[in-house]
Amino acid sequence: MVKVWWLKLMIKIKINGKDLEVKPKTSIIEVADQVGIDIPRFCYHKKLSVAANCRMCLVEVKNFAKPLPACATQVMEGMEIFTKSKFTKDTQKSVMEFLLINHPLDCPICDQGGECDLQDTAVAYGASKTRYTEEKRVVFDKNIGPLISTDLTRCIQCTRCVRFLKEVGGMAELGLVGRGEHAEISAYVDKSVESELSGNIIDLCPVGALTSKPFRYSARSWELVRRNTVSCHDSLGSNIEVHVKDNIIKRVIPKENESINECWISDRDRFSYQGLYHKDRINNPLKKVKNQWKEIDWEEAYELIKNKINTINTKKPNQLGILCSPQTTIEEGFLLKKISKQLNTTHIDHRLLEKSFSKNNNWLGCKIEEIESHDSILVVGSNLKNDQPLLAHRFRRFAMKNNSFSIITSYDDFNSTPCLGKIIGNPSTYLNYLLEILKEVQSVTKYKINSESIKNALKQIKVSKETKKISESLTRDKSKNAIFIGHQVLAQIEGDNIKIIAMHIAKAIGATFGVIPGYANSVGLSELNLSLDEVNTDEVINQKKESFIMINFDPYFDYHSPKKITKALKSAKFNIAISPFVSDSLKEFDIVLPMTPPTETSGTYMNMEKRLQSFAAVTPPHGKSRPGWKILRVLANFLELEDFSYDSSDEIKVEAIEEINKNYSHNIKDFENSKKNKIPQGLELISPIRAIDSDMIVRRASALHQNENIDQAFAYINPKTMLKENLIDDQKIKVSSEEAEITIKIKSDEKVSLNSILIFGKQLSTASLGMNHKLKIKRSS
């Protein structure tokens, strides 16, 4: 009996004589994949729209005179499909012959050789020789950037790359121009492809037309050893497959995990491996001797550290400050916490870029795959495309399906995302906007607020049209809404207040509340309760310490105030860096211990949805560098601390998970009506961090930094603000903050909020400004 799809009932069909019951509106190719019947395809991909232009999936269907494309034909009651009949095989052989007419016979030099869909399909479904003897066409290759190499003569016009960049990347950066044999893939006006997800078109291309430029001609596919691991560059925790030859990483591709990264990865995850082999990488422990680095052995390094720390601890207690990267694994974080307790120091933290230090609700609040199941979403203060490129794709997909996505941000980088409500304002205005939403929501839901300080703040608030529109979308008769706050909020002086108000809004409407964490193990270290006694990074830096231990970060780039951290390091008597790299930023350190990056160690990360993901080393340690957990374990043994006899990271993980499961309770701060820190008047600095500058490894990945002018810093200002300040495009100005003064060129950008200057953070020429200040400007002479 035929049952209609909206009642979720099934229809009966036959494939190759086999009776099946399937859901209506399912394509033939989807049904075949579900039951393990192979149908060849080039243009079809389960995550992209149907194009049906390669015709390779043509199959015979009973009562149809012509073969039908399996990707574009939906099953019907009683349909009989034949994928192995002579008619189907002859059709597929003809299509294969047609596709190979202009394809060059250059498989021996093609990077796709050995893993090419065209090769495999030609062998399985094609003829043994061609009848075509005419000249083949040649298509000139195009330069579409430093990441993707083009050999467009090989292209079979499947348009997977075109559809991916438009539908997933959000920008139509490639297109199919021309008709018939003149058709070819082209970038618009010969521009490069700049999507943060562009590298996925390399994997999507079924032939060798698009290949990895950094990987080009470096190895054959059968020479590579494939090892699975987890990305360390954002809090999504993308699953990746690393390809290794001679213990050197040659390329990185996605490992499918539908609930996290689906079958995609960001360009940052794909190409950052180049940074692992940068000239700054160190092989041996280094000791500062007359302002020069001298290589020493591990035992000498440990003895030196032991003597210095014991001397400092004997004279003054609690004089050791410990700061680590939020990329630190759970095992390393657990050992750091254990060391700090036994050394009687409470000054330890990992929140290097944050000024909001409340510990409650520091994760996404839901599973990643549940984002699209919400009815309405509000995101506050997140530069999604740079911070979390694949999460941005999920939000965009939600917005395309539901006209109920709203954003409050300081930079309008959401042109490809349909927004019901969009407020572009300075980070310092986020609190007022959320108070407006809370006031409107309270009037609708009659939500009771007990805090007197919030009540007093709401009395002074007037609700604008923009916030009323967002409030209405959140208070409609819906059962599942969500509010997410991003890194821009956590980096604000008012961050805790913003978080409190956002949580009240979520509570008033029964919505999910979540934080979009910045780094691979931000959530894990918070759950581990790494920062003891509510001490935070700023307090560690501002209190004069005799000694600092800093793990896996660059103090000049990765802390929000380079001036303050440099001053703290200068005043200390002995500083220890545990890092894979050495640079001028470490000039205030006395000793550097070479630590392996995540690809050369084992460990565990907890991603934004609180999912634990363990990984093993994919290559051996570089030189005499050692995994972080081993460095800390041996250091603890030299310091004669108790209970550090671990033989593997797995042993540490067991104890660390027990620590996480203790469920530490944290005091939720009350809303504070007055700002603690008064900042001078001026244009507000917006300092988002580009995906290619986020950490030490990515900053050293050469291919990611090869686009023209990509490392040239500019100050981006709204044209209206430029008019008000009497500034013009390409003018050089002097910009000064509380930290430093720099000279920089202006670019006008309508996406930037009014009365602000956008200067990307963590760049060499601009990092000295620090982050989140008011700026004073004057014309450069």
Regions inferred by a protein language model and the residue ranges of each:
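Long hydrophobic segments that form regular secondary structure
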Residues: D246-C263, R268-Y277, I282-K287, D297, ...
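N-terminal export/assembly segments and adjacent metallocofactor-ligating motifs
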Residues: M10-D33, R41, H45, E60-F64, ...
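Phosphate/pyrophosphate-binding active-site segments
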Residues: G421-I424, L431-V489
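Acidic/polar loop patches that form or flank catalytic/metal-binding clefts of enzymes
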Residues: L210-R216, I249-R251, I322, H347-D349, ...
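Short alpha-helices
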Residues: S410-Y411, T417-N450, G495, H504, ...
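A cross-kingdom feature strongest in bacterial/archaeal respiratory oxidoreductases
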Residues: Y44, K337, S373-D375, V379, ...
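Tryptophan (W) side chains
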Residues: W5-W6
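A glycine-rich, hydrophobic/aromatic-adjacent loop/helix-cap motif
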Residues: S479-Q543
